[in-house]
Every structure is written in structure tokens, then in C-alpha cells.
């Protein structure tokens, strides 16, 4: 297979929210049979057709970096984890729809990844305390994905999805809610698949067509997989 240009997308969120299952579904188009805790970082690759169906169509590698650990980790752990945040082109924030704390912690994950966890006292963890000015100048494309949609009782679904809609709005991001054990949520032509493709297109545009310093500062184009593993590819 010919070498392709690539972009790096972080997949962040609390342990147990289903990041590994999500990445496997995105890259292999299959349900992950035996999910396990991610230690360090695991890297999988998806092949994406930018502007599919247009004269500008071009194929890219999307590197999905599944970062393990807890957002409340000691500073030494955060320092070690920071190596994975170099030269990032996009961020997928993952939370468990049945666990409100995992949603609140996305603010802390995003601040950590964007190297802004040393500003203001009292890390922001709730929608009510969130200051959008913190991200006013952020140019890194974000996508919010809620997992375990199947575990929300029907009479609670409206309440939960209304709350998560505000969460995505805070990040100026689109949201996708799904069940990682059911591939139909990302079926070709579905609204979720369209949102996902639009996000990847935006990441590619920021990386290759808008050269104005939008990346997180780091080592330009250096591939640092750390303890991660490079796995097989999935075509859109």
C-alpha cells in the first residue's frame, strides 16, 4: 500500500467509558470481543477518504491514539502521559452516558491535552462552572462521543441527551451517541457516520490546508508511539 499522509487524533476519557471498544469499531468496523484496560497508549489506524465523492477526494491515514489512565492522576503520571499529546491534530472526547462524572471530567481531559490545566484555580468539572473563554482560541477540532446509549432507560433518555447536548456546545463540537456493541450506529450514510466523516475532514483541513499554527505545540510530524501498538487498517 502506498504511503499516505496522516493526521493524529487523541481519544480521551475516563477509564471504563469504552474508548478501546470505540476505536476498534471505528478502525475495524467490528465489535471488540474482550475489551481490556489500556496501559499507556494504544494506536490504531483508520483509512479515511477526505471530501469523498468530490474532485478533491484524497485518502489519508487517521491515527487514533487511545490514551489510558485517570484524569485525576498524580502530576508525575500526567507528565508521562503528556508525551502522547505532541503534534495533535484533533481530539475525540469520550464519556459514558450512564456516568455523569465521566461527562464532567471531559473538561479536565481537554484542559490537560491542550496544556491548559495550570490556569485558574479549581479545575473546571461541571457545566455550570465552565468558562468558555478557556477554549475561545482553541483551533484543534473536537468531537464528543457518548457511549453505552443502549443502557439508558427510555424514560431517562431525553434528560440525558439534553445534558450531553449542552456538553458538546461547551466544546463547540458535534456529538455522537452510540452503543459500541452495535455497528449500525456508525452505518454508512447514517447521521453519525456523516458527523464522523465531517470531523475527520475538518482535522485534515486544519493539518494540511490551514498552516497557521493550529496544532498543539510539540515535535512537528514526529511519530511518537511510546508504549502504543500500531494495528491494522479500516477503510471508510
Swiss-Prot record:
GO terms for cellular component: endomembrane system. SUPFAM superfamilies: P-loop containing nucleoside triphosphate hydrolases (SSF52540). CDD domains: RabL3 (cd04102). InterPro entries: P-loop_NTPase. It comes from the Eukaryota. GO terms for molecular function: GTP binding; GTPase activity; protein homodimerization activity. GTP binds at residues 16-21, 148-150, 179-180. It holds the Pfam family Roc. Residues 1-236 are annotated as: Small GTPase-like. Keywords: GTP-binding, Nucleotide-binding. One of its GO terms (biological process) is intracellular protein transport. Required for KRAS signaling regulation and modulation of cell proliferation. Regulator of KRAS prenylation, and probably prenylation of other small GTPases. Required for lymphocyte development and function. Not required for myeloid cell development. PANTHER family: DRAB5-RELATED. Homodimer. Interacts with GPR89; the interaction stabilizes GPR89. Interacts with RAP1GDS1. This is Rab-like protein 3. It comes from Bos taurus. The gene is RABL3.
Amino acid at each position: 500500500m502506498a504511503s499516505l499522509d496522516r493526521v493524529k487524533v487523541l481519544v480521551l476519557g475516563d477509564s471504563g467509558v469504552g474508548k478501546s471498544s470505540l476505536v476498534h469499531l471505528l478502525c475495524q468496523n467490528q465489535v471488540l470481543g474482550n475489551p481490556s484496560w489500556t496501559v499507556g497508549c494504544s494506536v490504531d489506524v483508520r483509512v479515511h477518504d477526505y471530501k469523498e465523492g468530490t474532485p478533491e477526494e484524497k485518502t489519508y491515514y487517521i491515527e487514533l491514539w487511545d490514551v489510558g489512565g485517570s484524569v485525576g492522576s498524580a502530576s508525575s503520571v500526567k507528565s508521562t502521559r503528556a508525551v502522547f499529546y505532541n503534534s495533535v491534530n484533533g481530539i475525540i472526547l469520550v464519556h459514558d452516558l450512564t456516568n455523569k462524572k465521566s461527562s464532567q471530567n471531559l473538561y479536565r481531559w481537554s484542559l490537560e491535552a491542550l496544556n491548559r490545566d495550570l490556569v485558574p484555580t479549581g479545575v473546571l468539572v461541571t457545566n455550570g462552572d465552565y468558562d468558555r473563554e478557556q477554549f475561545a482560541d482553541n483551533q484543534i477540532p473536537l468531537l464528543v462521543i457518548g457511549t453505552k446509549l443502549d443502557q439508558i432507560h427510555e424514560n431517562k433518555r431525553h434528560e440525558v441527551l439534553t445534558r450531553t447536548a449542552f456538553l458538546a456546545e461547551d466544546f463547540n463540537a458535534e456529538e455522537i451517541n452510540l452503543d459500541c456493541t452495535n455497528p449500525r450506529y456508525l452505518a454508512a450514510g447514517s447521521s453519525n457516520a456523516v458527523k464522523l466523516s465531517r470531523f475527520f475532514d475538518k482535522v485534515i483541513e486544519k493539518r494540511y490546508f490551514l498552516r497557521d499554527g493550529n496544532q498543539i505545540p510539540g515535535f512537528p510530524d514526529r511519530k511518537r508511539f511510546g508504549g502504543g501498538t500500531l494495528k491494522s487498517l479500516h477503510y471508510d
